[in-house]
């Protein structure tokens, strides 16, 4: 095409320069000025990498003064174009705009505009864009979205609770699973779902001070949720940035003490507009009708301001009725306002729980029990179902399940309370205790005698704590560098045990970090034993590395030496041997230690080794734990209660371990108390609540569905393709792990989630569980979600041109591949993507408008095509521009019909599901007072807004590919 002064062109290789103007032409060269950047470019006339910018009727263009017009006619005179049309601001018609006055900052956003302007993408980027659209749409439709991305084992009862609660509007529930069943993980799963779906954006977690870092680590490692830890220092810093310091972060963790200490701070917390509040260890909030504690009042105040509340607490039976009522009162003060009425309700509920237990056991029910069930369910025509459940017919089992299901819906607290017990959940290992009695060295005997004389004024509790750790008494007199490990028989025993069990992974726990560090040095120097150390003085990254080294099968550490605090919240169920180098002071800490290995998913029985020194507090405590509480070989829900009741006597025995008179009687009394309390707890088991909480077959099916999704090879192929195109280096490390590092030529300079040093990833859940240094990649991982956003939010891959070698078609045959997107715009919290995520519709049109997409599958077709360089591509586009315009118009006529079908299907699905949910909740509201009015209002409002948004749904062209047939 000849060049003329004043014409507008765009650079094929530097599209960021904007619209250029021809300012000089001679026999061999042409000069373009790019006004938006003030730069000039000199090109050879014969083969310049520039494309003529020409708009067509129907296009909207912008003048250099900023006003816009819709083009109705294009005139050409002496090689220059004049556009005639209607101004959009004044609606004046017949306005003429010469091309020289076009806005130079022109950005081509529509795929067809980019194609005609010579902004042609690489072919592989077009393919990636289509795959990103397709997979993104599929993921939104998954029924368990938000439950696949966490680094956890797929445990049915946890998935069941998270699936139920995570989809609710502003859930307010009590999670009261027994220890070791994963309340923290359940809460994390609920948060993950709510944040991913947009149902929540701001979350506050309040925990005891000692658990802050544990929660911080768990949320980051398991759920990729980056919380900010607020303490006095962070709060003071944030006051410089905002009136309310908590507005500076979306996800916050703080301690209960931090929240309670200052009135202004509590007010700031209440005003920060959180969507969800999580409170761990909620059973420590003391309440009575006359005198609630300050901690309880602080949480009560917060719970009034925050729509969603998750309380994590010990099991209700351990708490007592009043304490249990106090938790429920925080969730719904209107429903739980009268303690006496609550006690009466619970009494009335007892026969129902008994009847359910009989139904589940398959026993026949008496007429009285049948009548009571009929009244409890309160449905008309329930009689045939009751009779079927009580018969010997084939339908009896399904009738019983249906009755149990109906009772669950109506059960007093089943919507607000979830509680699983070890009895109701299978999959726990056995625990076997091995005690090793060792003589007390003379060095320790001397130190203990001197300590007894010098510490005569110490309290019994202080003396008891000293007597648990004789090595520390010895160091008090001999100095911190005293080499107690040279004569302590526990060290000799440990070295002998480890050298004779070289193939076993062994977790060693001791009370203090200093002990762990000293043991590591001794094991390494004396026996060459590879030991990792894990204590509270290490950073999260250092702990991750230590845990990863311990997890490595062949070259990893044989031993992990943990301090008490350092091991909080970490689980090592790939190991099954534990050594307690010393014993903790109370049964809760003992259970916490064993809980590092005793988790669901532990494949082997747990071997607990306790080497203890005779005539020390250790010898007293090992007997009390084992013979009095059976706390080593079984979980001990009664431990704290009995510990509190015999505290003074126990302390005296620990402080003077050689004075054992009456100790056998104490153990006998504790054992009797333990058995009685245990029987009482078992009798009080709420079978109906347990079934509701663990989900039964439904939960099992959910876990299996997610496990199948874990094997999806599409994710791996897509991720590798995505990393290639973004410019991320991939280095296969073996063992299903890959190291990702940034390259020098990235699509964006800083890709979110990829550090300068790189990261290790795995697509294998088992590897991710064993290797804490490897990130678990799923469709829900931020790395993939950020990659999808990067590709789909910009114009990467939105226009390209390819050659098809096919001798069956005439040379020059044109095909246009169009990727339309059908979508609706709505606030994220409406979760419209459940019904109509941005959905790609692919068309492959010839110039007669025939759609060949159904016959020609995308991936197969893509492999047959060849790339074209940008310069040649621009020339091809210019030659067939009018034909492409005509095909686009044919495509628009067809997409109208396809889009309407998709939108109508989405409307029908949304109407059916949301109306059914509303009807069910309204029906249950009549028989279950735990369904809150605001829940019903929210469901109705949500339904209306979803339907309105779907009414406004439309379509747009997202990407196009021009295909030209060649025989060469």
Curated annotation (Swiss-Prot):
One of its GO terms (biological process) is regulation of DNA-templated transcription. One of its GO terms (molecular function) is helicase activity. Residues 164-334 form the Helicase ATP-binding domain. A motif (DEAH box) lies at residues 280-283. ATP binds at residues 177-184. Pfam families: Helicase_C, RapA_C, SNF2-rel_dom, Tudor_1_RapA, Tudor_RapA. InterPro entries: Helicase_ATP-bd, Helicase_C-like, Helicase_RapA, P-loop_NTPase, RapA_C, SNF2-like_sf, SNF2/RAD54-like_C, SNF2_N. Keywords: Activator, ATP-binding, DNA-binding, Helicase, Hydrolase, Nucleotide-binding, Transcription, Transcription regulation. Residues 490-662 form the Helicase C-terminal domain. Its EC number is 3.6.4.-. Signal peptide: none annotated. NCBIfam families: PRK04914.1 (NF003426). Transcription regulator that activates transcription by stimulating RNA polymerase (RNAP) recycling in case of stress conditions such as supercoiled DNA or high salt concentrations. Probably acts by releasing the RNAP, when it is trapped or immobilized on tightly supercoiled DNA. Does not activate transcription on linear DNA. Probably not involved in DNA repair. Belongs to the SNF2/RAD54 helicase family. RapA subfamily. PANTHER family: DNA ANNEALING HELICASE AND ENDONUCLEASE ZRANB3 FAMILY MEMBER (PTHR45766), SWI_SNF-RELATED MATRIX-ASSOCIATED ACTIN-DEPENDENT REGULATOR OF CHROMATIN SUBFAMILY A-LIKE PROTEIN 1 (PTHR45766:SF6). Interacts with the RNAP. Has a higher affinity for the core RNAP than for the holoenzyme. Its ATPase activity is stimulated by binding to RNAP. This is RNA polymerase-associated protein RapA.
